[in-house]
Regions:
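Flexible "cap/lid" subdomain of the alpha/beta-hydrolase fold that forms the substrate-access gate
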Residues: 1-13, 17-171, 180, 192-205
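Catalytic histidine-centered segment of alpha/beta-hydrolase-like enzymes
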Residues: 175-184, 188
Length: 205
């Protein structure tokens, strides 16, 4: 996409599964990434991954087997509500309109299959990411690791320090995992404070 848009270098801002995609891109193409913001989700194979997997809130990482899709088919909203409720500081902040919207999308043919496939790929992701770190070393670009106060919190920066040399941490107060729904103002402010100074400096020069 960057090539199509003729963009040589970009800042990355990622959340959840996006962190994993972003980490792989940043590791493989460090010259294409200026700064990297990861929001409230661990990256497989980075830091104490096996210990992270023991967190009972991450039960879905290991929710697999031949019948999982049939168990959820037609009950997508029930399954998804557990995520929105358990991972929120205040479940009401993930509003009904958003819940209905995402539940309809996940009820489409193949959607839940793809969702489960993401989690099933984590073991291979961990192997690949450890190999990348072994071959290329830690990320060198500035990294901001944001955690929701009621979610990964300070653990985000601690874990990402195992995968990057220049890590800054930030906490979004009163927020769980869904930080853009729960505290968008603080989230945008944290991201802008990290990214904008570099852009301002480039503009002045």
């Amino acid at each position: 996409m960057l090539d199509s848009l003729k963009i040589a270098r970009a800042d990355l801002v990622t959340h959840d599964i996006g962190n994993m995609v972003g980490f792989a891109f940043a590791a493989l193409h460090p010259d294409r990434v200026g700064k990297f913001v990861l929001i409230d989700a661990p990256v497989p194979g980075v830091g104490p991954w096996e210990e992270i997997l023991k967190n009972p809130l991450l039960w879905h990482f290991r929710f697999g087997g031949p019948d999982m899709e049939r168990l959820v088919a037609g009950r997508e909203r029930i399954y998804l509500d557990r995520f929105w409720n358990e991972f929120s500081a205040v479940p009401a902040h993930f509003d009904e309109a958003s819940r209905e919207h995402y539940a309809k999308l996940y009820a489409l043919p193949g959607a839940m299959h793809s969702g489960f496939a993401q989690f099933a790929a984590f073991d291979q992701d961990a192997i690949d990411n450890r190999a990348l770190l072994g071959q290329k070393g830690k990320l060198k670009m500035p990294v901001l690791a944001i955690g929701g106060e009621k979610s990964f919190g300070t653990q985000m920066a601690t874990v990402m320090s195992a995968g990057a040399d220049n890590v800054t941490g930030a906490i979004i107060p009163g927020s769980g995992h869904w930080i853009m729904e729960e505290n968008p103002q603080a989230t945008v402010a944290a991201v802008r404070a990290f990214l904008v100074p570099a852009r301002t400096k480039k503009t002045k020069s």
